[in-house]
Amino acid sequence: MVDTESPICPLSPLEADDLESPLSEEFLQEMGNIQEISQSLGEESSGSFSFADYQYLGSCPGSEGSVITDTLSPASSPSSVSCPAVPTSTDESPGNALNIECRICGDKASGYHYGVHACEGCKGFFRRTIRLKLAYDKCDRSCKIQKKNRNKCQYCRFHKCLSVGMSHNAIRFGRMPRSEKAKLKAEILTCEHDLKDSETADLKSLAKRIHEAYLKNFNMNKVKARVILAGKTSNNPPFVIHDMETLCMAEKTLVAKMVANGVENKEAEVRFFHCCQCMSVETVTELTEFAKAIPGFANLDLNDQVTLLKYGVYEAIFTMLSSLMNKDGMLIAYGNGFITREFLKNLRKPFCDIMEPKFDFAMKFNALELDDSDISLFVAAIICCGDRPGLLNIGYIEKLQEGIVHVLKLHLQSNHPDDTFLFPKLLQKMVDLRQLVTEHAQLVQVIKKTESDAALHPLLQEIYRDMY
């Protein structure tokens, strides 16, 4: 602790050996700070010293961009000296504080030292080097000086100090000139504005590409489905399947190809289960093409691509299936047919349990009132999920999903400005979908074991294998 009753004495010269102590840099820096403050107070005895010059926006972890004020503590300033309060100007208020990085290492700058914005560490390093006339071993590697490694190469660090304009004859400690502050503010605002515009353009471009890929690769989307369900289509209304008789009629026309593979003579529930599988296989093919169009997906290892699709397709299928559903039933056969919810509930066990949970999910999901542009980003985020078992390049995939989720969040804010909780609601749906798929996979295993006629499609067998 500094004896505040005693005058502060100047630093005594240190031998080079003294600098080898692990604590010497911090000790010298702290003592140097005391001397600098003492000299500054002596030079500005008129009382114009202002604490406002030490306010800046924190950029370190945990600061959350809040305003931080570096005040002079008893350990670093003489308590016997009192500074009269001086009203600060508007441009020096905390609200207008600047977030400035050290020109040498990129750490947060504590002020304008030796002619440049520098942190306390680099300020002290430069001061010691000049005062003690230190000579460092030459380094030809042009080391990159950063906060985390700034103490490793002193030669390159000092060279960086000089290259950015640090000078012992320049302003050593104190307030930034008003002209410099105004110029810096203008540069920061211009830079932030340009970066924001550039980022916004990139995000909009990504959202557009994913939306276009969605519309291109899927035969049915929400826009088409809602027109048909609302009865506004110019074509014939969908054929309604509400009992066994209408199911048989539909099998001869709408889904004739699906039931022509040796299942036409089996009972209705088995034929229905077979049709469900055929539609799932077709959607898996569409999802594969959609995934390839997601920027960055094609760069993944092929094994990772397969893993992401294996674990993500059913979550995506049940998401998109919601667009084809209302409380009374769902569209089938590209919107040419409509099968009622009541009919599906009246199928025998366990087939009656296949669709009802999907209707429950769809009613809640549709209540969010998403459009195809929202759903396309949501499906892309589902596919590019970094926590799937067996992935190789987890870090890359997590960054890929993080980017898509960020675009989704901003897109929702723009597309649904009045629903501030839409994004967290949608994230919760990801959790709900996993539970829904788990229950579906368990039901399929039950059907596979108990229904000898209900064979699984080879592609779906591969997807279900070791899934849960």
From Swiss-Prot:
<feature type="DNA-binding region" description="Nuclear receptor">
    <location>
        <begin position="99"/>
        <end position="173"/>
    </location>
</feature>
<keyword id="KW-0804">Transcription</keyword>
<dbReference type="GO" id="GO:0050728">
    <property type="term" value="P:negative regulation of inflammatory response"/>
</dbReference>
<keyword id="KW-0832">Ubl conjugation</keyword>
<dbReference type="GO" id="GO:0035095">
    <property type="term" value="P:behavioral response to nicotine"/>
</dbReference>
<dbReference type="GO" id="GO:0032922">
    <property type="term" value="P:circadian regulation of gene expression"/>
</dbReference>
<dbReference type="Pfam" id="PF00104">
    <property type="entry name" value="Hormone_recep"/>
</dbReference>
<dbReference type="GO" id="GO:0030154">
    <property type="term" value="P:cell differentiation"/>
</dbReference>
<dbReference type="GO" id="GO:0045471">
    <property type="term" value="P:response to ethanol"/>
</dbReference>
<dbReference type="GO" id="GO:0035357">
    <property type="term" value="P:peroxisome proliferator activated receptor signaling pathway"/>
</dbReference>
<dbReference type="InterPro" id="IPR003076">
    <property type="entry name" value="PPAR-alpha"/>
</dbReference>
<dbReference type="GO" id="GO:1904189">
    <property type="term" value="P:positive regulation of transformation of host cell by virus"/>
</dbReference>
<dbReference type="GO" id="GO:0032868">
    <property type="term" value="P:response to insulin"/>
</dbReference>
<feature type="domain" description="NR LBD">
    <location>
        <begin position="239"/>
        <end position="466"/>
    </location>
</feature>
<protein>
    <recommendedName>
        <fullName>Peroxisome proliferator-activated receptor alpha</fullName>
    </recommendedName>
</protein>
<dbReference type="GO" id="GO:0046889">
    <property type="term" value="P:positive regulation of lipid biosynthetic process"/>
</dbReference>
<dbReference type="GO" id="GO:0004879">
    <property type="term" value="F:nuclear receptor activity"/>
</dbReference>
<dbReference type="InterPro" id="IPR013088">
    <property type="entry name" value="Znf_NHR/GATA"/>
</dbReference>
<keyword id="KW-0446">Lipid-binding</keyword>
<dbReference type="GO" id="GO:2001171">
    <property type="term" value="P:positive regulation of ATP biosynthetic process"/>
</dbReference>
<dbReference type="GO" id="GO:0051898">
    <property type="term" value="P:negative regulation of phosphatidylinositol 3-kinase/protein kinase B signal transduction"/>
</dbReference>
<dbReference type="GO" id="GO:0006094">
    <property type="term" value="P:gluconeogenesis"/>
</dbReference>
<dbReference type="GO" id="GO:0010468">
    <property type="term" value="P:regulation of gene expression"/>
</dbReference>
<dbReference type="GO" id="GO:0071332">
    <property type="term" value="P:cellular response to fructose stimulus"/>
</dbReference>
<dbReference type="GO" id="GO:0061052">
    <property type="term" value="P:negative regulation of cell growth involved in cardiac muscle cell development"/>
</dbReference>
<dbReference type="GO" id="GO:0001666">
    <property type="term" value="P:response to hypoxia"/>
</dbReference>
<comment type="subunit">
    <text>Heterodimer; with RXRA. This heterodimerization is required for DNA binding and transactivation activity. Interacts with NCOA3 coactivator. Interacts with CITED2; the interaction stimulates its transcriptional activity. Also interacts with PPARBP in vitro. Interacts with AKAP13, LPIN1, PRDM16 and coactivator NCOA6. Interacts with ASXL1 and ASXL2. Interacts with PER2. Interacts with SIRT1; the interaction seems to be modulated by NAD(+) levels. Interacts with CRY1 and CRY2.</text>
</comment>
<dbReference type="GO" id="GO:0042060">
    <property type="term" value="P:wound healing"/>
</dbReference>
<dbReference type="GO" id="GO:0001223">
    <property type="term" value="F:transcription coactivator binding"/>
</dbReference>
<dbReference type="GO" id="GO:0001227">
    <property type="term" value="F:DNA-binding transcription repressor activity, RNA polymerase II-specific"/>
</dbReference>
<dbReference type="GO" id="GO:1903427">
    <property type="term" value="P:negative regulation of reactive oxygen species biosynthetic process"/>
</dbReference>
<feature type="site" description="Essential for heterodimerization with RXRA">
    <location>
        <position position="433"/>
    </location>
</feature>
<dbReference type="GO" id="GO:0008270">
    <property type="term" value="F:zinc ion binding"/>
</dbReference>
<dbReference type="GO" id="GO:0001216">
    <property type="term" value="F:DNA-binding transcription activator activity"/>
</dbReference>
<dbReference type="InterPro" id="IPR050234">
    <property type="entry name" value="Nuclear_hormone_rcpt_NR1"/>
</dbReference>
<dbReference type="GO" id="GO:0019902">
    <property type="term" value="F:phosphatase binding"/>
</dbReference>
<dbReference type="GO" id="GO:0031435">
    <property type="term" value="F:mitogen-activated protein kinase kinase kinase binding"/>
</dbReference>
<keyword id="KW-0597">Phosphoprotein</keyword>
<feature type="zinc finger region" description="NR C4-type">
    <location>
        <begin position="102"/>
        <end position="122"/>
    </location>
</feature>
<dbReference type="GO" id="GO:0010467">
    <property type="term" value="P:gene expression"/>
</dbReference>
<dbReference type="GO" id="GO:0070166">
    <property type="term" value="P:enamel mineralization"/>
</dbReference>
<dbReference type="GO" id="GO:0045722">
    <property type="term" value="P:positive regulation of gluconeogenesis"/>
</dbReference>
